[in-house]
Amino acid sequence: MSCRLLLYVSLCLVETALMNTKITQSPRYLILGRANKSLECEQHLGHNAMYWYKQSAEKPPELMFLYNLKQLIRNETVPSRFIPECPDSSKLLLHISAVDPEDSAVYFCASSHGENTEVFFGKGTTLTVV
C-alpha cells in the first residue's frame, strides 16, 4: 500500500512540475532604477483566462489583472502605471512605466480554463527597484 501511495505522490509531483514548465515568465529577476519595463508570460495549456498577481514582501498575492477570453477585468486599486496587454490567448504582458521602489515585489502570471477553475502559476518575476 505504501508503494502505491509513494507512486501516486510522485506522479502528482511530476504532473505539477510539467504544468509549471507550460507557463513561462521572463525575465526571472530584474533590478533597475526608475525606468519603463515589460514583463512577459506565455502559457501552453490552452487556457482561456490569464492573470497577473503582485506579491509584496510579507503580504499575500494580490490580483492585478485578469483576461478571460481576452476581456480585461482590472483591479481598480492598481496604479495606472501598470498596463496589461494580451496580444493573443496564450501571451500576457505587463508594462510598467516609471517604476517606483514600492513596485518591488514578485509578479506572478497564472492561467486557467476560466474564472472558477484550477489556476496554474508561473515561477514569478522578482522586481527590485533601487
UniProtKB/Swiss-Prot annotation:
Residues 116-130 are annotated as: J segment. One of its GO terms (biological process) is cell surface receptor signaling pathway. Residues 113-115 are annotated as: D segment. SMART domains: IG, IGv. This is T-cell receptor beta chain V region A20.2.25. InterPro entries: Ig-like_dom (IPR007110), Ig-like_dom_sf (IPR036179), Ig-like_fold (IPR013783), Ig_sub (IPR003599), Ig_V-set (IPR013106), TCR_beta_variable (IPR050413). It comes from the Eukaryota. Coiled coil: none annotated. Keywords: Adaptive immunity, Glycoprotein, Immunity, Immunoglobulin domain, Receptor, Signal, T cell receptor. The keyword ATP-binding does not apply. Pfam families: V-set. Residues 22-112 are annotated as: V segment. GO terms for cellular component: plasma membrane; T cell receptor complex. Residues 1-21 form the signal peptide. PANTHER family: T CELL RECEPTOR BETA VARIABLE 4-1, T-CELL RECEPTOR BETA CHAIN. It comes from Mus musculus (Mouse). Glycans are attached at residues 36, 75.
